[in-house]
Amino acid sequence: GCLLGFDQDEDALANVPEDDRFIFVNHNFRYLRNFMRYYGYEEADGILADLGVSSHEFDEAGRGFSFRFEAELDMRMNQRSKLTAIFRNYGEVENARRLVDLIVKARANQEIKTSEAFYQIILPCIPKLKEKKYLAKVYQALRIEVNGELEALEEMMQQAMEVLKPGGRLVIITYHSLEDRIVKNFLKAGNAEGKLEKDLVFGHVHHNFELVNRKVIVPSEEEIVRNPRARSAKLRIARKKD
């Protein structure tokens, strides 16, 4: 057998095992089908997708995605309406409009280049008792937009449905409500909206997956103690129908 591992982070190369059965693909998993064919595989027995940002990425100051370090900000800033939608939809930031007003006002005077500068700009709208959680939402929203993460997730799941063998498992670990909602809907209905599609003639429901775990799997308290970053993880499993 062979295991293909996808990671678009070049730093992940340092952790690649020396095993002829393992193929490291330094690209986003949205290219799943293309690279399977490139390496001579048309079908997969199973697919595991861990959607979390690695601890290394959180801890590496050079990424510009963590609010804990002073680093050059690796993010695009868009027009006001688009930026508001990004924070509201991808980060579920409650005061998104006020947040964007501060960003736009500051950007009119100078370019926002560092995480520290960004933090100082948005400081007036950060809840004092929920600073860490608020900042996590803000940076999550920007990361999702910059990387096109939700679109990539949908593309990967659609391809997974095509390349999995009958009986093959699709296992996905999510870490926030937006991506979990998409995964939940797709595994139940075959699309991100969760709408079951019926045959126009007989009215039969067409869907290629059946759920293995009806109830989402979450980490135990013991696991959270060992790995606090697993606190928000949710694991869903589906089987491709025969």
Where are these regions (language model features)?
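S-adenosyl-L-methionine-dependent methyltransferase catalytic core, i.e., the SAM/SAH-binding region
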Residues: 1-242
